[in-house]
Amino acid sequence: MGASASVLTGSKLDAWEQIRLKPGSKKKYRLKHLVWASRELERFACNPELLETAEGNEKLLQQLEPALKTGSDSLQSLWNAIVVLWCVHNRYKIGDTQQAIQKLKEVMGSRKSADAAKEDTSARQAGQNYPIVSNAQGQMVHQAISPRTLNAWVKAVEEKAFNPEIIPMFMALSEGAISYDINTMLNAIGGHQGALQVLKEVINEEAVEWDRTHPPPVGPLPPGQIREPTGSDIAGTTSTQQEQIHWTTRPNQPIPVGDIYRKWIVLGLNKMVKMYSPVSILDIKQGPKEPFRDYVDRFYKTLRAEQATQEVKNWMTETLLVQNANPDCKQILKSLGPGATLEEMMVACQGVGGPTHKARVLAEAMATAQQDLKGGYTAVFMQRGQNPIRKGTIKCFNCGKEGHIARNCRAPRKKGCWKCGQEGHQMKDCRNGKQFFRQILASGGHEARQLCAETSTPISPTDGGGSEGTGESGTERGPERALSVCLPQIPLWDRPIVTARVGGHLCEVLLDTGADDTVLNNIQLEGKWKPKMIGGIGGFIKVKEYDNVTVEIEGREVQGTVLVGPTPVNIIGRNILTGLGCTLNFPISPIAPVPVKLKPGMDGPKVKQWPLSKEKIEALTAICQEMEQEGKISRIGPENPYNTPIFAIKKKDGTKWRKLVDFRELNKRTQEFWEVQLGIPHPGGLKQKQSVTVLDVGDAYFSCPLDPDFRKYTAFTIPSVNNETPGIRYQYNVLPQGWKGSPAIFQSSMTKILDPFRRDNPELEICQYMDDLYVGSDLPLTEHRKRIELLREHLYQWGFTTPDKKHQKEPPFLWMGYELHPDKWTVQSIQLPNKDVWTVNDIQKLIGKLNWASQIYQGIRVRELCKLIRGTKSLTEVVPLSREAELELEENRERLKQPVHGVYYQPDKDLWVNIQKQGGEQWTYQIYQEEHKNLKTGKYTRQKASHTNDIRQLAEVIQKVSQESIIIWGKLPKFKLPVTRETWETWWADYWQATWIPEWEFVSTPPLIKLWYRLESEPIMGAETYYVDGAANRETKLGKAGYVTEQGKQKIIKLDETTNQKAELMAILLALQDSKETVNIVTDSQYALGVISSQPTQSESPIVQQIIEELTKKEQVYLTWVPAHKGIGGNEKIDKLVSKDIRRVLFLEGIDQAQEDHEKYHSNWKALASEFGLPPVVAKEIIASCPKCHIKGEAIHGQVDCSPEVWQIDCTHMEGKIIIVAVHVASGFIEAEVIPAETGQETAYFLLKLAARWPVKVIHTDNGPNFTSTTMKAACWWANIQHEFGIPYNPQSQGVVEAMNKELKSIIQQVRDQAEHLRTAVQMAVFVHNFKRKGGIGGYTAGERIIDILASQIQTTELQKQILKXHKFRVYYRDSRDPIWKGPAQLLWKGEGAVVIQDKGDIKVVPRRKAKIIREYGKQMAGTDSMASGQTESE
């Protein structure tokens, strides 16, 4: 008592005894109250010595205050006494307990206000990274952003990757910044172009909204007054630093442009965070054993990513935080009341539910409880094993001793299998007759997934999946077999709460394997009880202990000890669960099967099994029995009608057999899959790492379950010799080898499994391709290998094993056909075979090896070898090696003798590419960062066009290398090319649309390539002009080619087995052969012009090769094109000469010939109508469908869709403004206007205006964010417009609108001085282009052309309706000399005075007065001058 009484002495003790317990009460505090308080504090595990000082009292009050709302009256009295004692220590004059409590609230409130004010002041002083400061002259100047702040921002973006943390990080770093500083921060993260584009859209939309709500004042500004900021001024694009400072700091109505801009950025960041972190706040729930602190961290991290107002976020915090907590924490949080702060919640829920908290409370209870209760605890613990129902003994799988299980074993963990003792596998994989012990239930010996036939749990690869049990387990249990046929399974996805009957009372209980005792609340049990105190959630509780209480759960009864007391949750502990025979089961391979279906309308394969030899049958039987034991396949009965044939081949060693299944028929019928990994990783793209490990996943496919509904389609049959017994039928439970879906499903499953490990171990670089894993890191070797073991354990938990024999720890590492060393890599050793006789299959394998070696060995060539196997040949056909192929093969052998190595990628250095031409149209290239240290090499021999030249092939090589670089390293290299800038630009000026190439700088490296001849761009003065032409008959293959000159010279030759194209080229060859050193050649063939004008230097066509040889002999050649049938003298003359006796024309039946003729000559509609006897509207439609007769500026090679209702739309920029341009592809008609922002809303509004003026069915745009926005999709859906996008790397797909952009800008520059605003100049330029500039076929303007095209389309549509209608009629007619009616004939055309009919293959023209037209209603009789039906001709 002396220690307790020493809390107060002297005057303080006198003051203590003067304070009343309650206002107006006669009772006062005495010394005994201090003694009582000291003992109570010991009960709550608090130090009584803290009562001696005011600071100690404050600590006690802070510790006890959270429990007041749920505490007992005794706790409230203790807290009141400590409050009074605190006032006495501080010498506050109080009269009773109520005044003491009031005094405490006042003091604590004033402290909080002072602390908050202090924090606010310090935050204002230290929070602004870029304050606007006043200089010595009193002017407000800007303090520039510091590199340290900028570096912190860049590092945050790279590490957080737009997670919710990036928003408070941005707000902290940009505190006090103006728009200029914020734009500097955004420019520093320019590598994230996709995210910045989203941010740009938000800024544009907010700027437009600002301009709408803050219109500029009308009229000029007063002198000396600075304008009000617009939306673009706030964004910093059209304002200066001084203006931003003035708007922020001006005394009258300041506008904090920096803060406004920060709000816009935060809106954009919220949008990006939502994209990068798509988890909803509703999905954040606390796990059963998750600490409350971790749950709160996840909750607020996701809350920051929610795009909601602050009021909504406050509501989420008040409701969802409590609602989604686990039941243990939720019970405590609800007891705190609705006004609890986050601090109070975290203090109250600290350690709740975790095993650490329970262990600490239990230890304190055992240390402080009275001695007579210790026996009670001992009795509780000794209750295990005393249950009369429990049979058998517990045996440890680790040490082999009885009395405990392996989890509680104190002996060292035994390596290897717990059953047979061998290393290399675990007990679950042991094949010595028993299954994994975790899958055996204590009460029946059945596997966990075989307990109940109604379970829907997916079958693991190690489970047989059938319903047959082993005979061993059946005989071992005896009578209990009937009780365990179908035991209940309780999953742990949610809290395991069941209904139990305890002492005859029904109640909801929680099955808690972490609790020793069974504790219930609000239940009256019969019999004697004894008092007991146990440690629980929130402290100690007093309970009543009943013995031998009957507990019934799921139909099974057990008697045991039950405690009754004020527990928040009814708990069934291990003392009852053990008696019930309840066990925890861990299923292997929890991978969810991927749903798979057959193609619509198809059924499974039903292919008969072909005969097999006896040794193959025996081998397949043994293999399938082993697979069945491992659960990979299951036996099936005759109810499955499907079958796939199987066979067996010997492995490479020649001793073991391998089972193969012919899944070709099933693959045809299975749905299509998307390959989630389109290529293999390349070692040149790996970064050099200090530690490297290579792993291989064993039985990769057989570790992934197959969709249970699809398994029946994988059925196969093992036949018997001489059909002695029915065949044994099986189906697959796992992914089969050879099935088309196995690679995609395995890759997808493997990626999902590795994702959490990648997130938890960012230091590791994991490259995954199928079952091969490369793991590299810069960690020390010991730490790296620890991480590897964690990875192997992680994979093992999901059912994937990593065999030790394929676990490579030391270099060199064999991976994906490569050999990896610490500082270099190469391909694995390649041996080229020496053969006297080569087959097609041998050549194919040889070319594959050489192509594989070419990625690191320079100069590998295979062109001559590829020539050997051209055409359709059998794989076993013998191929003699040509002299060139033998020489090429020997050169490759010599190159492969010298070892060559590549190096690893260094991100901080630039990529360079060297390209060389090897001769024979073969190219090689090397990609490197340092000279003579190649990352990758390669070759190029493919020829996309039949006629090409070195410049065009070089462009194709650049394109190939660029795409490889983007795939492997994610960026473009710099090129060193064997060409001069002048040679390149000479060809590229006209052929810029032939292919895509990236931006690159010219570094010419010898030997240089060049153009061997050049076509002149203007006619050659004084040179003779040759008009050339050719014609061929498609049926007879006969043709003519020739030329005429303006001097009267002409030459015509006859051709056999030719085509129109060959005849046209032969005519040009004749002109070149017969002309002098300089010549002008005129052709009407677009095909011939396209071939020759691309200046090829080699060609697969013999005629083109001869033309190239003739061109190299000439000094100057001018080649041009004119349209056919335009009355051009020389062209018309040669056309008649070569067409004589060649062409044949039929009316209407000759539409195909007319289209072919137009593709060749591009004649106008009048010429087509005259030559082929077509109606004008039909001839005009042929013209309208030809892109070359309407489009100006299109690429020389390639065409675009020129249907009458197709438009191309694009955005271009001029004078800092955005111009949106729409071009009618078929006519070149333009619609354009200036838009305020390049957003989806503005683009969609422009599209709707366009659709309101013209018929628009299809639009073609690029992949810009404004065109791919949801607003644009909605506009296209509403207007029923099909939206097509451009092809990446192919600007020709947007060639029409790109050319029109250039022309429109040219016209704008011509009329710009006539307009004050750009938008006015744009409309003036559109008017000039559409109605003041003529050109093209017929000399139309674009406006006239679009009207003519649309009118012709309407006429053609009506004409087609008439033609289809006319085909429904039959005609009876008579000749002038024969009065007998003939027919019926088919009606082809009905004119004003005559009809065209077809009778028995002959086409005739009959006057209307001698023809009777009737509808075909079946067999009808025709009378003289009368119709067989009442239908008139007008119908």
Curated annotation (Swiss-Prot):
Site (Cis/trans isomerization of proline peptide bond) location in chain: 219-220
Chain intervals for the UniProt region annotation (Dimerization/Multimerization of capsid protein p24): 276-362
Region (RT 'primer grip'): 813-821
Binding site for Mg(2+) 1: 696, 771-772
Domain Peptidase A2 per the UniProt entry, residue ranges: 507-576
Cofactor dependency: Mg(2+)
Catalytic activity: Specific for a P1 residue that is hydrophobic, and P1' variable, but often Pro; Endohydrolysis of RNA in RNA/DNA hybrids. Three different cleavage modes: 1. sequence-specific internal cleavage of RNA. Human immunodeficiency virus type 1 and Moloney murine leukemia virus enzymes prefer to cleave the RNA strand one nucleotide away from the RNA-DNA junction. 2. RNA 5'-end directed cleavage 13-19 nucleotides from the RNA end. 3. DNA 3'-end directed cleavage 15-20 nucleotides away from the primer terminus; 3'-end directed exonucleolytic cleavage of viral RNA-DNA hybrid; DNA(n) + a 2'-deoxyribonucleoside 5'-triphosphate = DNA(n+1) + diphosphate
Active site: 512
Cross-referenced InterPro entries: Aspartic_peptidase_AS, DNA/RNA_pol_sf, Gag_p24_C, Integrase-like_N, Integrase_C_dom_sf_retrovir, Integrase_C_retrovir, Integrase_cat-core, Integrase_Zn-bd_dom_N
Signal peptide feature range: none
Motif Nuclear export signal boundaries: 16-22
Domain Reverse transcriptase: residue ranges: 630-820
Region of interest (Interaction with Gp41), residue spans: 7-31
Region of interest: Interaction with membrane phosphatidylinositol 4,5-bisphosphate: 73-77
Domain RNase H type-1: from-to ranges: 1020-1143
Span of zinc fingers (CCHC-type): 394-411, 415-432
Region ranges (Interaction with host CALM1): 8-43
PROSITE patterns xrefs: ASP_PROT_RETROV, ASP_PROTEASE, INTEGRASE, INTEGRASE_DBD, RNASE_H_1, RT_POL, ZF_CCHC, ZF_INTEGRASE
Domain (Integrase catalytic): residue spans on this chain: 1200-1350
GO molecular function: aspartic-type endopeptidase activity; DNA binding; DNA-directed DNA polymerase activity; exoribonuclease H activity; lipid binding; RNA stem-loop binding; RNA-directed DNA polymerase activity; RNA-DNA hybrid ribonuclease activity
Single GO cellular component term: host cell
Lineage: superkingdom: Viruses
The keyword S-adenosyl-L-methionine is assigned to this record: no
Entry protein name: Gag-Pol polyprotein
Gene: gag-pol
